[in-house]
């Protein structure tokens, strides 16, 4: 491949990577404005968990906290 084509592919890849990162940051900002709870934070019927995380409560329906999904735990394990 010519150097111009390689440079073009590199630039397109870089732009795609930056756009994906910006989208993640934007979604985090939207969720924080919406008032959702992050991982291991308190939750209730009025205070939902962010990113579709489950709200897990104790047996007497108190001390509810947002738990990470299996996908998040799996991803963190392999990023170490």
From Swiss-Prot:
Cystine residue pairs: 36-50, 43-55, 49-66, 57-64
Q: Which residues form the propeptide?
A: 23-34
Protein name, entry field: U19-lycotoxin-Ls1a
Source organism superkingdom: Eukaryota
* Keywords, comma-separated and alphabetical: Disulfide bond, Knottin, Secreted, Signal, Toxin
Identify the Pfam families for this entry. Answer: Toxin_9
Could you tell me where this protein is found in the cell? Secreted
Q: Member of which family?
A: Belongs to the neurotoxin 02 (plectoxin) family. 05 (U19-lycotoxin) subfamily.
Q: Which residues form the signal peptide?
A: 1-22
* Expressing tissues: Expressed by the venom gland.
Q: What is its main location?
A: secreted
This entry carries the following GO cellular component terms, namely: extracellular region
**How are the domains described in the entry?**
The presence of a 'disulfide through disulfide knot' structurally defines this protein as a knottin.
């Amino acid at each position: 491949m010519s150097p111009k084509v390689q440079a073009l592919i590199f630039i397109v890849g870089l732009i795609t990577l930056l756009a994906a990162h910006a989208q993640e940051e934007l979604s985090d900002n939207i969720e924080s404005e919406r008032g959702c709870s992050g991982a291991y934070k308190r939750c209730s019927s009025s205070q939902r968990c962010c990113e579709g995380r489950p709200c897990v409560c104790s047996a007497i329906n108190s001390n509810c906290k947002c738990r990470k999904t299996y996908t998040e735990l799996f991803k963190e394990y392999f990023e170490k």
